[in-house]
């Protein structure tokens, strides 16, 4: 085997390995959403997360990849030359690998929205907007940054998706949850906010730990390979990713301890995710120390955003997806313009704190505003149309009964528990 073939094989394996870890994150998202919500909707949550990957894989292969990476203009790729990955028989191994790796990223962006709109969304509507995210919302945004589009030309940097995946998903989560409305009983007429606890914190914690593992594919494998200096960048990204997550978790634990008198379990778990989201854009360009600062700030922003969105804006987000992915994704995007200090990865930019002036910060801010506007405008149109058509939310009685039963004909995700409970009641 020649050196060139061996290098290609190693790079392909690296991307496939990372892609499998990112695919496994679907399990983590499913468990976080299920654990943080009520048991009567568990089966529905499982179906939604499976739908994201099923639809996402077919749709992204069909047209999404072409929209994202096809030759076109600064706004959109022209998909027809790349539809079905046209000419697959002559495609290089790395083309197939890149398709798989980007497919799992696309599915992740769609999955984020599921948590914020949990427990009251019509399954038909979910299938429609999940497909729309994979069809054009994510690919067009991705083209702007990763497909050679206009933000890429300006020097916008998002190494692994703080903006393209997480901020995009968080923005869609916000407009979707706001338009859909809250769960029954979440807010009273006199303005009181009721806590609706999840049914299994253990499942939620296991989901977070699985996501943490998956992030070691999400970020390091975004080098695109291990050759041409990729291994050095990947090694650094492992460290910055992990440090940011740990710093964010510690910060969240002490923040809630001081503010509420006890360290909050679910908030600390979300703190891990907030740190991971925040470091995803700058992880290749920042020092380990800077990654800790990014994690700390991300955690504080998340801790402030969750109660603000819940109690002030009255937007019901059962899992905190808007804050974790939207707010922390925005912070991570801006953090590039502040803390970027390593140009060895190929990005010709330095952050404000490292002598780069305001240029990089301005580009990152422009990119963030543009991507938020894209997701908010398109998402609002999509969700309003679904609501006007009577498809977006389920009927009140269906929500009360639980979506497992009304949407899927599943008596319970925990039938043994239901049988035991009913037996005790009949005694």
Name each region found by the language model.
Residues 1-427:
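Glycine- and aromatic-enriched membrane alpha-helices
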């Amino acid at each position: 085997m020649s050196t060139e073939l061996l290098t290609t094989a190693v790079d392909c394996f690296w991307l496939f390995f990372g892609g499998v870890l990112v695919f496994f994150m679907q399990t983590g998202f499913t468990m976080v959403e299920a654990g943080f919500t009520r048991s009567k909707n568990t089966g529905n949550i499982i179906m939604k997360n499976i739908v994201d990957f099923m639809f996402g894989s077919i749709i992204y292969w069909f047209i999404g990849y072409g929209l994202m990476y096809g030759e076109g203009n600064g706004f959109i790729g022209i998909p027809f030359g790349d539809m079905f990955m046209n000419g697959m028989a002559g495609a290089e191994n790395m083309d197939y690998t890149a398709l798989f790796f980007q497919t799992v990223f696309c599915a992740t962006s769609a999955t984020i929205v599921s948590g914020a709109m949990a427990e009251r969304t019509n399954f038909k509507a979910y299938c429609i907007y999940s497909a729309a995210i994979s069809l054009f919302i994510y690919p067009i945004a991705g083209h702007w940054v990763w497909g050679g589009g206009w933000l890429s030309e300006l020097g916008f940097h998002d190494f692994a998706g703080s903006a393209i995946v997480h901020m995009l998903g968080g923005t869609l989560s916000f407009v979707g949850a706001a338009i859909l409305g809250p769960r029954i009983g979440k807010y009273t007429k006199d303005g009181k906010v009721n806590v609706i606890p999840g049914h299994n914190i253990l499942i939620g914690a296991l989901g977070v730990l699985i996501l943490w593992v998956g992030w070691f594919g999400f970020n390091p494998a975004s080098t695109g390979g291990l050759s041409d200096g990729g291994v050095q960048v990947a090694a650094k990204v492992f460290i910055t990713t992990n440090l940011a997550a740990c710093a964010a978790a510690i910060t969240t634990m002490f923040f809630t301890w001081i503010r509420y008198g006890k360290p909050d379990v679910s908030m600390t778990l979300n703190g891990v995710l907030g740190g991971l989201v925040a470091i995803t854009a700058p992880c290749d360009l920042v020092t380990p120390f800077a990654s800790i600062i990014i994690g700390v700030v991300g955690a504080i922003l998340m801790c402030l955003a969750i109660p603000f969105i819940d109690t002030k804006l009255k937007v019901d987000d059962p899992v905190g997806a808007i804050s974790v992915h939207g707010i922390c994704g925005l912070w991570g995007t801006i953090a590039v313009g502040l803390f970027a200090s390593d140009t060895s990865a190929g990005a010709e930019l330095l952050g404000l704190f490292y002598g780069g002036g305001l240029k990089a910060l301005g580009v990152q801010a422009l990119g963030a505003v543009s991507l938020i506007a894209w997701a908010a405008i398109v998402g609002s149109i999509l969700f309003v149309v679904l609501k006007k058509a009577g498809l977006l939310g389920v009927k009140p009685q269906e929500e009360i009964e639980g979506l497992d039963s009304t949407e899927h004909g599943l008596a319970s995700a925990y039938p043994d528990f239901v049988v035991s409970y009913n037996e005790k009641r009949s005694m």
